[in-house]
Amino acid sequence: MELFSKILLVITLTTAFLSDTCAQERSIGTSWSFTGIGLTYDHLVKETAFVHVGAQLEMTETFIGRARIPGGSVSFTWNDILGSTTSRNGNRISFFTGAGAAAGYCKDFRVKRKEQVRYGSFFGLKGRAGVKIEYDRNINITAAVAPVLGMHLFKKEETVMMRYYRYGLLQTLMPELTISYRF
């Protein structure tokens, strides 16, 4: 977990101190979904794009009782705002999509009942698509899907095994809800 904290710190500091974006809008919050819970940081880079950085406890196996300890992951996506509108009461509604990367350490989904799945590292490309509502009281609520197309590495006996990251694909079906404070 110490490495996890250092990676998140480096990503956050790099994003926060980009020279062209220091005066832009930022938000920090929490995300919830069936796949896990986490902390998020969004940084508006320009009027039509924002950066999303997330650190998440991978809880799927924990929620269904197959693991005692959750895994962890970090992710980074560059999101383009496809369109936005303002409601009658001043709230801004934006539709976005983006791409980036994710990496972490967790237990992957098992397909067969007798299959043993071990903890291991994963990495891959991450997509993100959703809708963000920006309220006039500096609160954002975002609903998004964020699949990861990647690989899962784990040790089986004395061999390192690699296969596609199954939970990354299942995240397409499990939307996440994020509530954040904008400053």
Predicted feature descriptions by range:
Residues 136-183:
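Predominantly the C-terminal beta-signal and adjacent terminal strand-loop region
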Residues 43-139, 179-181:
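Gram-negative (and chloroplast) outer-membrane scaffold detector with strong preference
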Residues 5-6, 28:
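Generic early N-terminus positional signal peaking at residue ~5-7
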Residues 24, 110-115, 159-163:
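Extracytoplasmic loops and strand-loop junctions of Gram-negative outer membrane beta-barrel proteins
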Residues 1-3:
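N-terminal secretory signal peptides that target proteins for export/translocation
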